[in-house]
UniProtKB/Swiss-Prot annotation:
This is Large envelope protein. Belongs to the orthohepadnavirus major surface antigen family. Keywords: Acetylation, Caveolin-mediated endocytosis of virus by host, Fusion of virus membrane with host endosomal membrane, Fusion of virus membrane with host membrane, Glycoprotein, Host-virus interaction, Lipoprotein, Membrane, Myristate, Transmembrane, Transmembrane helix, Viral attachment to host cell, Viral envelope protein, Viral penetration into host cytoplasm, Virion, Virus endocytosis by host, Virus entry into host cell. Isoform M is N-terminally acetylated by host at a ratio of 90%, and N-glycosylated by host at the pre-S2 region. Residues 107-142 are annotated as: Disordered. A lipid is attached at G2 (N-myristoyl glycine). One of its GO terms (cellular component) is virion membrane. InterPro entries: HBV_HBSAG. GO terms for biological process: caveolin-mediated endocytosis of virus by host cell; fusion of virus membrane with host endosome membrane; virion attachment to host cell. Glycans are attached at N346. It comes from Woodchuck hepatitis B virus (isolate 1) (WHV). The chain crosses the membrane at residues 210-230, 282-302, 375-395, 402-424. Its main location: virion.
Length: 426
């Protein structure tokens, strides 16, 4: 039957017409009171039509008789129960409505009609049979079931969805007009819509992604060369400590492999000093990583993001352990508090210092184990109080060691700049 409507009639009964769906069921009076509620359908007396033309004529006349301006239509808030969905009696006759547009007068230019007719085949004209069309994906299985009971169930479910105001506005496309009734139409079973999803993603890389990848590779290569340069300069400085008069040529020559003259900081793999050179550079790399870790810890400690509990708390407040993730002052931002000594579901909450919690903790830990560090406290306080003298001392040290540091510091400049940016923006 394609997508044409199936309309069922009985010679001696009345056809109950369901609005906004386009399917007719025969009944003298609503047999199923739980489903066919009074007032939600239109009725008309039909003489049993013998031909398709008579059926079309009766439907058109019925449309013209309905006063669409005063018709209340399908109640918006009507809820249909999902019980007693019996199909029409088997004695009813089934006719198929041929496609023919039916325009309802009085409706705001809402198109009413049926699906276009199917293209006739060439099987009866002596030509070769038309190859069968591959079946389309069934997107509305509840509308095409052969079992009429399940068909009626899907019909009632779809009818309930049409009773909401949102579906009415989406159907008519006029958000500024209040359409309380759903205008009845004779329409076919909805055909599978053409699915228009997102466009397929192109497997090719976009220009912006390619530029970002190239820029990232360039940054990695730059940092790697700088790290190698830093390791080479530190290796040179380390080796120079053993030779105050200057670094001589490498004496670790291998008798089996003749190597040219070179410095101890650039030994080839065939030289006996090659393993010692890379051992020194491995230690240098570990020291650089340790320096970065210390910088990160100092930064987090200065921001107050390290939850380190003090050794000797000054204030105590007993709160519930589950709520001990906030500070004593009921602040939901760092610093947090520490929960110790849980007893009977409660604990002692000690506030963490706002900054330098790790430094204070390490200093207190060192003082508890090395009492002689207490002697340095007055000296440190004195150095902090005479900042001018400390500045002069620092200037003098830089002036004395400046020429020697100029050959070592340039490779560190990018790392210093990176540390400064991290310190400022984090």
């Amino acid at each position: 039957m394609g997508n044409n409507i199936k309309v069922t009639f009985n010679p001696d009964k009345i056809a109950a017409w369901w609005p906004a769906v386009g399917t007719y069921y025969t009944t003298t009076y609503p047999q199923n009171q739980s489903v066919f509620q009074p007032g939600i359908y239109q009725t008309t007396s039909l003489v049993n039509p013998k031909t398709q033309q008579e059926l079309d004529s009766v439907l058109i006349n019925r449309y013209k008789q309905i006063d669409w301006n005063t018709w209340q239509g399908f109640p918006v808030d009507q809820k249909l129960p999902l019980v007693n969905r019996d199909p029409p009696p088997k004695s009813a006759q089934t006719f198929e409505i041929k496609p023919g547009p039916i325009i309802v007068p009085g409706i705001r230019d809402i198109p009413r009609g049926l699906v276009p007719p199917q293209t006739p085949t060439n099987r009866d004209q002596g030509r070769k049979p038309t190859p069968p069309t591959p079946p389309l994906r069934d997107t509305h299985p509840h509308l095409t079931m052969k079992n009429q009971t399940f068909h009626l169930q899907g019909f009632v479910d779809g009818l309930r969805d049409l009773t909401t105001t949102e579906r009415q506005h989406n159907a008519y496309g006029d958000p500024f007009t209040t359409l309380s009734p759903v205008v009845p139409t004779v329409s076919t079973i909805l055909s599978p819509p053409s699915t228009t999803g997102d466009p397929a993603q192109s497997p090719e890389m976009s220009p912006s992604s390619l530029l970002g990848l190239l820029a990232g590779l360039q940054v990695v290569y730059f940092l790697w060369t700088k790290i190698l340069t830093i390791a080479q300069n530190l290796d040179w400085w380390w080796t120079s400590l053993s030779f105050p008069g200057g670094i001589p040529e490498c004496t670790g020559q291998n008798s089996q492999f003749q190597t040219c003259k070179h410095l101890p900081t650039s030994c080839p793999p065939t030289c006996n000093g090659f393993r010692w050179m890379y051992l020194r550079r491995f230690i240098i790399y570990l020291l650089v990583l340790l320096l970065c870790l210390i910088f990160l810890l100092v930064l987090l400690d200065w921001k107050g993001l390290i939850p380190v509990c003090p050794i000797q708390p000054t204030t105590e407040t007993t709160v519930n352990c589950r709520q001990c993730t906030i500070s004593v002052q009921d602040m939901y931002t760092p610093p947090y508090c520490c929960c110790l000594k849980p007893t009977a579901g409660n604990c002692t909450c000690w506030p963490i210092p706002s900054s330098w919690a790790l430094g204070n903790y390490l200093w207190e830990w060192a003082l508890a184990r090395f009492s002689w560090l207490n002697l340095l406290v007055p000296l440190l306080q004195w150095l902090g109080g005479i900042s001018l003298i400390a500045w002069f001392l620092l200037i003098w040290m830089i002036w004395f060691w400046g020429p020697a540091l100029l050959s070592i510091l340039p490779p560190f400049i990018p790392i210093f700049v990176l540390f400064f940016l991290i310190w400022v923006y984090i």
